[in-house]
A protein has these predicted regions:
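Short beta-strand-loop/turn "lid" adjacent to the catalytic site in phosphate-handling enzymes
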Residues: 65-103, 131-135, 166-187, 210-213
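Residue-level signal for inorganic ion chemistry
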Residues: 24, 47, 77, 105, ...
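N-terminal glycine/serine-rich phosphate-binding loop of ATP-dependent small-molecule kinases
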Residues: 1-98, 126, 154, 226-227, ...
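Active-site core segments that coordinate phosphate-bearing ligands/cofactors
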Residues: 6-7, 116-128, 133, 142-174, ...
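Short alpha-helix plus adjacent loop in nuclease-associated cores
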Residues: 101-118, 436-437
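Core-facing hydrophobic residues within beta-strands of well-ordered domains
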Residues: 74, 206-208, 395
Length: 500
């Protein structure tokens, strides 16, 4: 019987799953789209049962129906999800409200300032290696405590999306150590433990789950979960992690200097480093197993920019938009765009940032507008890479993955703007592929995540074209200057992202 492993990833706009054998061959795969809700500007949520758990059940049934061997051959399960998210549950394990999503949700700006004023920015950074931002969970937890007292009164545990799925599968409350970086100021980065000394007015420590490494077995599949999923009872379930970490693993990040660049609805990148490197503009973290470290960051919008444009000006397919962009040229007809349509994460850490189209004229075309957004993504990636290099963290090899990476036009523009070669893996499943490998590591079929090269092969290399370098260098300077010149005009009005 060919031993195999199930990996499943819950993303911002879709969920994907695959069953992979011990040699890294994909036996079957499936995906399902879903939406997120935006009840108010700056608020982003998903229903934990309908989307997170519902997608898991749907995809399990689909995979098991397609699997051409006994389901008993599945020797491990791992999940990854968007994150860090905030989901309060009651004593019965029932969600009390929709899950609050990661850095694109900016409702807790007042709470960020409140925590910083009470504890001090430098105290928080010294203990956790993080600056508080819209990516941080604790300000959102405090927001719930202040604004939804009826929810807070019933809250027994606070989970992230992956933790909720692991709970549904095993009955155990867990959080992986990589994802715990999102819980500043109550997570001690170096000790890898919860730290009650800075929790104070935020929450009681017993509301937090148990901390485990991502490939550690959290428990076995319960009989109830087996009946619901169709999986055999007793299958080991590992702790899992955030989607970007599994995406990095699934693209072949194994050595220090390897960097995963994920292009999805948003962007996230992970650079493997030889040690912890806390930097104010980014997020330093332990990685998926003891002795592994990363520096991470990401842009708030990438694929969502092009989705917005297509929905706002309907009637053209993605291919038609890209063909129009081909009729434009480097420099996008003089249009410079700022891609901050949902604020910006790294390196700006500015949730109040706004999108901008600058330099338009009656001669501007739809292709110029589309290309200006493509170039804006490239400029944003370049900004991040430059700031990481200033901090002493350099990428020796970049692996590109995610739905937006399927656009060779976009990938070439980003490569030309940054001057960095990008590699595309042969297997493009991404996070769920990394999840399957995590499940295999948890089952002791591999000794370490560093053996991922036994599964992953790189297929294509995209190298920079020098012909447009001068144009893009000038465009990049204009891009940087445009943000600095307009940021004071674009501050969010009072009350837009939260309750006063």
């Amino acid at each position: 019987m060919n031993e195999c492993f199930l990996g499943l990833d819950i993303g911002t706009g879709s969920s994907k799953a695959a069953i992979v054998d011990i040699e890294g061959n994909v036996l079957c795969q499936a995906s399902v789209p879903h939406e997120m809700s935006m009840p108010r500007p700056g608020w982003y949520e998903q229903d934990a049962d309908r989307i997170w758990w519902g997608d898991f059940l749907l995809l399990c049934r689909k995979l098991l129906g397609d699997l051409q061997q006994p389901k008993e051959s599945i020797k491990g399960v791992a999940v990854s999800t968007i994150g860090p998210c905030v989901l309060p549950i009651d004593e019965a394990g029932t969600p009390l409200r929709p899950g609050i999503l990661y850095g694109i949700d900016t409702r807790a700006e007042k709470e960020i300032r409140e925590i910083e004023e009470k504890l001090g920015k430098e105290v928080i950074f010294a203990k956790t290696g993080q600056d508080l931002s819209s990516q941080s969970c604790c300000p959102k937890i405090l927001w719930i405590r202040k604004n939804e007292p009826e929810v807070w009164e019933k809250t027994s545990k606070i989970l992230t999306a992956s933790g909720y799925l692991v709970y549904k599968l095993t009955g155990r409350y867990t959080l992986d150590i990589y994802s715990a970086i999102g819980y500043a100021p109550v997570f001690d980065l170096e000790k890898r433990t919860w730290d009650p000394s800075l929790a104070g007015f935020i929450t009681e420590m017993e509301k937090f789950p148990e901390l485990l490494w991502s490939g550690q077995v959290a428990g076995e599949l319960t009989q109830k979960a087996a009946e619901l999923t169709g999986l055999p009872p007793g299958v080991p379930v590992v702790t899992g992690t955030i989607d970007a970490a599994s995406e990095a693993l699934g693209t072949g990040v194994e050595k220090n200097g390897d960097m995963m660049m994920m292009y999805g609805s948003s962007n996230f990148f992970i650079l493997k480093t030889e040690s912890l490197r806390p930097v104010h503009s980014f997020w330093a973290s332990n990685f998926l197993e003891p002795g592994s470290f990363v520096l991470t960051g990401g842009m708030s919008t990438v694929g969502s920019l092009f989705k917005w444009l297509g929905e706002t000006f309907p009637g053209r397919s993605v291919a038609e938009w890209e063909n129009l962009a081909l009729e434009s040229s480097p420099g996008a007809g003089g249009i410079t765009s700022l891609p901050y349509f949902a604020g910006e994460r790294t390196p700006l850490q500015d949730p109040a940032a706004k999108g901008v189209f600058f330099g338009m004229s009656l001669a501007s075309t739809a292709g110029d507008v589309y290309r200006s957004l493509q170039e804006a993504v490239g400029y944003g990636i370049r900004h991040n890479i430059e700031e990481m290099e200033k901090a002493g963290a350099r990428a020796d090899r970049i692996m590109a993955i995610g739905g937006a990476s399927e656009s060779r036009q976009l990938m070439q523009i980003i490569t030309d703007i940054t001057g960095c070669t990008q590699n595309l893996p042969r297997q493009k499943l991404g996070a769920c592929y990394g999840d399957a490998f995590l499940a295999a590591v948890g089952g002791n079929y591999f000794d370490s995540i560093d053996e991922i090269s036994r599964w992953v092969r790189l297929e294509e290399e995209i190298t920079p074209h020098e012909t447009s370098k001068a144009i893009y260098d000038e465009g990049y300077e204009r891009y940087r200057e445009l943000y600095n010149s307009t940021r004071h005009l674009l501050s969010q009005p009072r009350g837009e992202t939260g309750i006063d």
